[in-house]
Amino acid sequence: MVRRLLALSRPLYWLYEQRLLREVKRGPMPRHLGLILDGNRRYARALGLSPTKGHEFGVQKAYEVLEWCLEMGIKTVTVWVFSTDNFKRPPEEVETLMNLFLREAERMAEDHRILEHQVRVRFIGRREGFSPEVVRAIERLERRTEGHRGMFLNIALGYGGREEIVDAVKRLLLEAEARGLSPKEVAEGLTPEDIARHLYTAGLPDPDFIIRTSGEIRLSGFLLWQSAYSEFYFADVLWPEFRKIDFLRALRSYQARERRFGR
C-alpha cells in the first residue's frame, strides 16, 4: 500500500514542481544568492551514520543546487561551507573535512559543469589553518576559472563575518599607512564604501537573498556587512534533504516581497 501511494505521488510531485518552476521563472531573480548549508551532521545522525557521511551528502546536494541556480540564471552565488568556528570541532572530523575540501577542489577544476557554464570559482575567508595541499588545490581552481564569465561562485571556507570586517579594516589601514596618511586622517575620511572596497566580496553586488536550511533562524555571522538589506528565508529542512521544490518556494517568497532598502 505504501509503495503504491509513493508511486502515485511521484507524478504529482513532478507536475507541481514544473508548475512552480514556470511560475518562478516569470519573476525577478536575486542577482546574488547566499546559501548557509546547515544540517549535514544532524541528517547523518538521524540515519545512524557518521558525520563524514552527512558531509558527503551535503557536497552532492551543493552540486545539485548549483545546477538549479544555473537553470534560474542567478549570476552570483555564495555558499558557506566551513566557518572559523568549525575548527573547534573534533580533530578527526576536521581532518575528514580537510580531505573532503582537497578532493572537491581538485574535482571542481575538471568538472564539466564548471567548465561548460563558465563558472568562476573564488574562495573567501582566511586560509590559515588549512594544509598546504588544500591551499594549493583551491588556488589552482581559482586560477583555472579566473577567466570565466558565467556564474560567479564564492565558496566561504574558513569564513567568519566578524573576521572579514577586521581583515577589511586591517587592509585599509595598511594601505593608508603606505600612502603616508595619519590615523586621524583615516578616521576623518572613512566611509562605508571604503570598508566595502576591502571586503572579501569587493566588486560584487551585496546578496539580495539569503537562504539557510535546518530551521535555525540566525545568520551566525554570514556576510555580516553585506547582508544589511538582504531578504532572508529559513527553510525547515536539513541541507541534504533540500529539494528543488523547497528552492523554488524560497525564490517565490523572495519575489513576493517589496524591498525597501531602509526607506
Swiss-Prot record:
<keyword id="KW-0460">Magnesium</keyword>
<dbReference type="GO" id="GO:0045547">
    <property type="term" value="F:ditrans,polycis-polyprenyl diphosphate synthase [(2E,6E)-farnesyl diphosphate specific] activity"/>
</dbReference>
<feature type="binding site">
    <location>
        <position position="231"/>
    </location>
    <ligand>
        <name>Mg(2+)</name>
    </ligand>
</feature>
<feature type="binding site">
    <location>
        <begin position="39"/>
        <end position="42"/>
    </location>
    <ligand>
        <name>substrate</name>
    </ligand>
</feature>
<dbReference type="GO" id="GO:0016094">
    <property type="term" value="P:polyprenol biosynthetic process"/>
</dbReference>
<comment type="subunit">
    <text>Homodimer.</text>
</comment>
<feature type="active site">
    <location>
        <position position="38"/>
    </location>
</feature>
<feature type="binding site">
    <location>
        <position position="55"/>
    </location>
    <ligand>
        <name>substrate</name>
    </ligand>
</feature>
<dbReference type="Pfam" id="PF01255">
    <property type="entry name" value="Prenyltransf"/>
</dbReference>
<feature type="binding site">
    <location>
        <begin position="83"/>
        <end position="85"/>
    </location>
    <ligand>
        <name>substrate</name>
    </ligand>
</feature>
<feature type="binding site">
    <location>
        <begin position="218"/>
        <end position="220"/>
    </location>
    <ligand>
        <name>substrate</name>
    </ligand>
</feature>
<dbReference type="InterPro" id="IPR018520">
    <property type="entry name" value="UPP_synth-like_CS"/>
</dbReference>
<feature type="binding site">
    <location>
        <position position="38"/>
    </location>
    <ligand>
        <name>Mg(2+)</name>
    </ligand>
</feature>
<dbReference type="InterPro" id="IPR036424">
    <property type="entry name" value="UPP_synth-like_sf"/>
</dbReference>
<feature type="binding site">
    <location>
        <position position="87"/>
    </location>
    <ligand>
        <name>substrate</name>
    </ligand>
</feature>
<dbReference type="InterPro" id="IPR001441">
    <property type="entry name" value="UPP_synth-like"/>
</dbReference>
<protein>
    <recommendedName>
        <fullName>Isoprenyl transferase</fullName>
        <ecNumber>2.5.1.-</ecNumber>
    </recommendedName>
</protein>
<keyword id="KW-0479">Metal-binding</keyword>
<feature type="binding site">
    <location>
        <position position="212"/>
    </location>
    <ligand>
        <name>substrate</name>
    </ligand>
</feature>
<keyword id="KW-0808">Transferase</keyword>
<feature type="binding site">
    <location>
        <position position="89"/>
    </location>
    <ligand>
        <name>substrate</name>
    </ligand>
</feature>
<comment type="similarity">
    <text>Belongs to the UPP synthase family.</text>
</comment>
<feature type="active site" description="Proton acceptor">
    <location>
        <position position="86"/>
    </location>
</feature>
<dbReference type="GO" id="GO:0000287">
    <property type="term" value="F:magnesium ion binding"/>
</dbReference>
<comment type="function">
    <text>Catalyzes the condensation of isopentenyl diphosphate (IPP) with allylic pyrophosphates generating different type of terpenoids.</text>
</comment>
